[in-house]
């Protein structure tokens, strides 16, 4: 159900459309002020944990030690690994890296990886985007005489038994919203100085992990977009469809899904190859690998769309949906959970059966429901981690019924009706300039999303039908709008629709800008 939000006054010194949207999505004036403020400069942490990590790496160079970078298979983990690999190479430290197979090995530093590192002659391991829960692997490293630097941003639940932990909780307040790549960037800076390509990787990773775009995370993302537009990191540019200008939305919906696809579709590709792709300067190799990445992403889309449709039919009226399919690819659980969460406007867990008797999967939440806090107290997890808006978990099949009962028991704690709101647009507030101003405020915090607007009875409506989408062209206050309804929204197109709800953006194609609406609903 949609609620029409009518806001009479604009309390901010911006276009009426922008000010009213900000009033709708947040009452936090401090955060709104930060979004409206001029872009800030990137400043690097001087925290002791960062400097201690840097000093240990410098010592490794002096001693001619071999350093193993232990990464992760999602966008943030791959970008973190690439940042650390590039930095150690440039500084002259002997190093290698390894990202585990999502299905066969699971998340984080594993005991067998530590054992293999010992066989290969590594004396120091640095984790990136993981490590705060790798207790068994850290213990094994101590037994084998290998030192471990944990560089991570995930929530710390128990003390991490390492001498050097580099983590936002131990850094200045400005860095509290960093992803794993943001943490890796701090170490990189003190080894090789500021490198624009590394800023791009860290900014893209922050978007990939949906980090709150405040404090030092905000200029990091803004600079990443700017440097990508200026031509830095051509490997990432090759993941953007030709003719499209790079912006936050292009990164979120084109670059990041492709970077994530190799980890999700681990039966088709080795995610470790993605680090080579990001760092290679060979254009021919970039072009070849970009095509392969695109192919894998297309396969990921096919699988997730088919399975999402099947699981949507199993949705019941629960506050937290628990959907199980034993034949589902583990790597697409989070994608499907996110899609269903957006559709039903409730938290959703999507789980599958892996080798043996283990059930694993991912969950996604909605603003106002902290999924991590809601689920963290179940006593029979084999593995559990995440944050407010997302989680990953593993339980033995014999404990799955107990888990379902546990979720059912916490229903009342999160059973809140969160209606979807859309700002009703007054015709005189709508202009090309206003939508341009709105785009300059990106990236939006995840709790704001890209705010929905409600356009009622526009003029000059023209309907066009395409294989994967439908388009409506219409005018509002004399401004032309192209409204796009994608097939994967699961909404029936109506050529006679006069009410359109969706998000606004500027679509730049072949140097021509036009107002675009991505339709969320219509009638």
Task: For the regions a language model picked out, list residue spans one by one.
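Hydrophobic helix-and-loop "lid/oligomerization" segment in the mid-to-C-terminal part
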Residues: 4-124, 144, 192-405, 418, ...
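Flexible glycine-rich surface loops and low-complexity tracts that mediate binding to linear polymers
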Residues: 496-510
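Non-transmembrane, aqueous-exposed alpha-helical and coiled segments at domain scale
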Residues: 413-419
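Beta-strand/loop nucleic-acid-binding surfaces
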Residues: 478-492
């Amino acid at each position: 159900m949609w609620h029409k939000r009518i806001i009479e006054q604009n309390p901010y010194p911006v276009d009426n459309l922008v000010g009213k949207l900000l009033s709708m999505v947040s009452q936090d004036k401090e955060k709104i002020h930060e979004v409206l403020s001029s872009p800030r400069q990137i400043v690097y942490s001087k925290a002791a944990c960062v400097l201690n990590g840097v000093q240990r790496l410098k010592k490794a160079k002096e001693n001619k030690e071999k350093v193993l970078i232990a990464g992760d298979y999602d966008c943030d983990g791959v970008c973190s690994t690439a940042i650390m690999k590039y930095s150690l190479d440039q500084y002259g430290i002997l190093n290698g890296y390894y990202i585990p197979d999502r299905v066969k090995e699971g998340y984080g530093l594993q005991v067998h990886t530590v054992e293999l590192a010992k066989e290969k002659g590594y004396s120091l391991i640095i984790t990136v985007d993981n490590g705060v829960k790798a207790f068994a692997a850290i213990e094994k490293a101590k037994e084998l005489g290998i030192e471990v630097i944990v560089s991570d941003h995930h929530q710390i639940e128990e003390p991490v038994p390492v001498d050097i932990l580099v983590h936002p909780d131990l850094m200045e307040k400005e860095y509290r919203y960093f992803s794993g790549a943001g943490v890796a960037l701090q170490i990189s800076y003190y080894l090789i100085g500021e490198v624009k390509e590394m800023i791009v990787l860290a900014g893209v990773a922050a978007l990939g992990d949906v980090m709150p775009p405040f404090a030092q995370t905000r200029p990091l993302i803004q600079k990443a977009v700017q440097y990508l537009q200026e031509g830095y990191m051509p490997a990432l540019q090759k993941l953007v469809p030709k003719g499209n200008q790079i912006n936050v939305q292009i990164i979120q919906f084109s670059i990041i899904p492709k970077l994530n696809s190799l980890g999700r579709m681990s039966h088709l590709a080795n995610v470790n190859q993605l680090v080579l792709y990001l760092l290679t300067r060979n254009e021919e190799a970039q072009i070849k690998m970009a095509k392969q990445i695109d192919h894998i992403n297309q396969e990921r889309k096919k699988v997730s769309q088919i399975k999402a449709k099947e699981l949507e039919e199993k949705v019941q009226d629960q506050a937290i949906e628990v959907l199980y399919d034993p034949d589902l690819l583990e790597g697409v659980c989070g994608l499907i959970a996110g899609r269903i969460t957006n559709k039903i406007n409730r938290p959703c867990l999507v789980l599958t059966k892996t080798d043996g008797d283990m059930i694993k999967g991912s969950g996604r939440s909605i603003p106002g429901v902290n999924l991590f806090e809601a689920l963290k107290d179940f006593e029979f997890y084999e593995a559990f981690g995440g944050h407010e808006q997302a989680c990953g978990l593993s339980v033995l099949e014999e404990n799955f019924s107990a888990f379902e009962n546990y979720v059912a028991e916490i229903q009342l704690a999160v059973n809140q009706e969160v209606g979807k709101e859309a700002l009703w647009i007054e015709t005189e507030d709508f202009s090309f300039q206003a939508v341009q101003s709105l785009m300059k405020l990106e990236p939006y915090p995840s709790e704001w999303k890209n705010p929905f607007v409600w356009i009622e009875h526009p003029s000059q409506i023209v309907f066009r039908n395409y294989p994967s989408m439908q388009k409506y062209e219409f005018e509002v206050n004399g401004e032309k709008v192209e409204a796009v309804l994608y097939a994967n929204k699961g909404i029936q197109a109506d050529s006679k629709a006069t009410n359109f709800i969706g998000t606004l953006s500027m679509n730049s194609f072949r140097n021509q800008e036009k107002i675009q609406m991505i339709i969320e609903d219509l009638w």
